[in-house]
Amino acid sequence: MDALEQARAEIDAVDTQLAALFERRMAAVLQVAEYKRAHGLPIYDAARETAVLEKAAARIQSPALRPYYKNHVQNLMDVAKQYEAVVLGQNRAAYQGVEGAFAHIALRALFPHAEAVSYPTWDEVFDAVERGDAARGVVPFENSHAGDVSAVLDLCYNHPALWVVDVYDLPISQNLLVLPGTKLDQIKSVYSHQQAIAQSETFLRQFGLPATAMANTAMAAKFVAESGDASKAAIASVETAALYGLEVLVPSINTDGDNTTRFIVLSREKPTGGNRFSLLFTVDNKPGKLGEVIQIIGASGFNMESIKSRPMPHVPFEYYFYVELVGDPTADETAALLRELDRTCRTVRLLGVYTK
């Protein structure tokens, strides 16, 4: 046996021991979950996690290995929280629309074992997560062709109790769906979500097809299927066609071949780590104040990947701002940046922490 085989054999032996220890650990996690159920305690305990990570770092003698072990322990705690959520019946994820909607597809990719719960509007998804009716919410945030989903950003601003804990980029292929046997020249009206209509505007204009906006693409497909009217068509996914018994008459009608929608994941639990973080802030309506904030961010060494502005609710002609920054949200530099922004901005809030 050469050196490589010996090393791999040692890894296999250690992995066998780790598997038994993992089962032992998860049995203890089950006891913790049952105690939390009996005493009405939340799954996430920030103070406990901080203490566990500090003890974990102290166990490792090698400074080079210490951060890797801390990441390993953090992953173990994340798995434990997921297991506790299942045990406590909190394995529910909310989305807007009906089965087959792009949000439902994104949810299934993110949480394949979760109980998917549908709500009619984005507002109700936010409310469900905030109330604790769902542990997570999956909503669209922006599209590479049609731009921001402004209403969702406004909901983030208006729900300070919620965090963005993950993002997911879903490649979007918009398709013209019809009743079986329908020809293109029979179609008189098209139904879909406003974003899908915007993403398919070149095709619609080419064939002179008027479009009507609906709550989402899957609802449009369901409407066309239930109408039984061959003059109606929907713009939606291939998965939706199969779900509602429709045919794909024209595939990939979106103008942008690289059409992608970014979804965000909402949670009541504060995220612990990642390589991106996002902020919401407001500034005094004075010359140069926004520029001052941008200069502070730049001077702190953070790359700004996105900046957006939106009108402030009930405050005419004033705006709040959203920025996404590249960096470790737990680093000392991030804490220093937030302190500096707190002194400069009228308000500032850490909205999200995630890996991208």
Q: Which residues does each predicted region cover?
A:
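Domain-level signature for soluble enzymes in the chorismate/prephenate branch of the shikimate pathway
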Residues: 1-356
